[in-house]
A protein has these predicted regions:
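Residue-level recognition of single "structural anchor" positions
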Residues: 1-191
C-alpha cells in the first residue's frame, strides 16, 4: 500500500476567488499541503488493485480504515512506514513490512508494483491534461479497471465490465441500441 499525491484541480470551473493557474505550474506551498489530493492505493502481486482519493495532504487513520473491506484478514502488507496504516494492520491482523529505503528492497520485499501503478496513473493524467479533483474517484475507478483488463481480450473485458455494472440500472430503447452501436465490440456470432 502506498499513497500518491496530485495537485488539487478546479479544471472546468470558473471561480472568481481562485486565481488562474497554467498547466504544469507548481503549487504555491512546498511539500504536502492542502493543495495536494491524496490517492491511496493498494496493489496485489497478482494484479488486482484499489485506488481512492480520500482527502487533502496525508491520509488519516479513518481514511485508511475505509479501505478495510478490500483487504483480507491475515494478509501481508508492505508500506512505506506511514503511521496511519497501523490501525488497519492491527484490525485486520496482517503481517507488515516497512520498506523505506533502497537497502530494505529485495526480491520479495518491495513496492515496485504500486510504484509502477503510480507511473501509469501519471501517464494517464498527462494524457487527460489533468483531472478535476471533483471527479478524481471516477477516474480512479477507470484506472483500476484499465489495469485489471490490460491482459484480457475483448470478450473477457466485456464480461468483466458487465459484472462490474451488474447492480447499476441503465435503460435503452431498441432504436438507441441500433443507432448508437452500444454493442459494437461483440462479435457477430454472439448477436
Amino acid at each position: 500500500m502506498d499513497e500518491k499525491y496530485v495537485p488539487f484541480s478546479h479544471k472546468g470551473t470558473k471561480i472568481s476567488s481562485v486565481p488562474g493557474k497554467k498547466r504544469g505550474e507548481p503549487a504555491s506551498k512546498r511539500g504536502l499541503s492542502d493543495e495536494q489530493v491524496c490517492l491511496l492505493s493498494g496493489v496485489e502481486r497478482l494484479g488486482k488493485s484499489i485506488l481512492n482519493a480520500f482527502n487533502l495532504a496525508k491520509p488519516t487513520n479513518q481514511d485508511i480504515l475505509k479501505m478495510k473491506n478490500h483487504i483480507q484478514n491475515h494478509s501481508f502488507i508492505w508500506t512505506d512506514g506511514l503511521s496511519s496504516y497501523n490501525e488497519l494492520i492491527e484490525e485486520k491482523q496482517c503481517d507488515h513490512k516497512i520498506v523505506k529505503t533502497k537497502d530494505d528492497y529485495d526480491r520479495v520485499n518491495h513496492l515496485n508494483n504500486v510504484n509502477s501503478f503510480h507511473q501509469k496513473i501519471e501517464a494517464q493524467y498527462k494524457r487527460y491534461k489533468g483531472v478535476a479533483s471533483k471527479y478524481i474517484n471516477r477516474y480512479a475507478a477507470l484506472f483500476t479497471m484499465q489495469r485489471e483488463c490490460r491482459d484480457m481480450d475483448s470478450m473477457e473485458t466485456l464480461i468483466y465490465i458487465k459484472r462490474k455494472l451488474k447492480k447499476t440500472k441503465c435503460y435503452f430503447y431498441i432504436r438507441q441500441i441500433t443507432t448508437l452501436d452500444i454493442f459494437t465490440c461483440i462479435p457477430e456470432r454472439f448477436t
